[in-house]
């Protein structure tokens, strides 16, 4: 059994830290035992389980879980737009909105910002993604997008992956300004995006339920924005108006209870990712960022 410690770089301090492991007993059961692997496969391929968990988390009785969760994962309750006592269920807290000042948006039209709170990996060249795919799990852009023409446009492009842990703020935002198209739903399974699970199978990005939106941006070209559901997170909720102009940092939607992932694709020579993110990613280390921080700058020849 590989170590259940998962390290990341805290962007604000530069320190390497250990990520809290949610549901460590269940993860160990799913990874180490034959029965666990069978149960895990069944649960991920049967959306009924995620629907049941989702409904349970919307019950009023789950309010009792909010305070212990906040204390265990040291969540700053002062950032929330509403006090903890106002939330009607655990899921109501999970999809909470934050005060605008809690996540300032990095200014400048030449700056692309991080779309969500989470742990980031960036790949200046999508071709390099295979170098990170351990245990012979190969990455396929065509499988991710299920659109051969679109995949060909980004084969030489760049990619950013933001993995949201259960304790993260779970609303996601636009990284650039522009015209946002209509999301395209691709139904799929609901495999976990827990870091230890991703080490075993990076292909979950192309197997899980996901929604794809194309943003037409003057500064960054055509940006592909992908939300990927996970175990307990079958619900991806969009809150923006398709076909409308969206501002950088504007809310796009939210994930219901659980962990989840956002993937951004950029056309070739459109973005230069920030040096710290590139450096850490090359070492196989995620960088934990907050929504609205700089992700990279517009490419200029």
From Swiss-Prot:
Please spell out the taxonomic lineage of the organism that makes this protein.
Bacteria, Pseudomonadati, Chlamydiota, Chlamydiia, Chlamydiales
- Which enzyme type, at the first EC level? lyase
Q: Name one GO biological process term.
A: phosphatidylethanolamine biosynthetic process
| Protein name from the UniProt record | Phosphatidylserine decarboxylase proenzyme
Kindly state the subunit structure of this protein.
Heterodimer of a large membrane-associated beta subunit and a small pyruvoyl-containing alpha subunit.
Task: Record the organism.
Answer: Chlamydia muridarum (strain MoPn / Nigg)
Give a GO molecular function annotation for the protein: phosphatidylserine decarboxylase activity
Residues found modified as Pyruvic acid (Ser)? 260
User: What cofactor requirement does the entry state?
Assistant: pyruvate
Membrane topology of this protein: Peripheral membrane protein
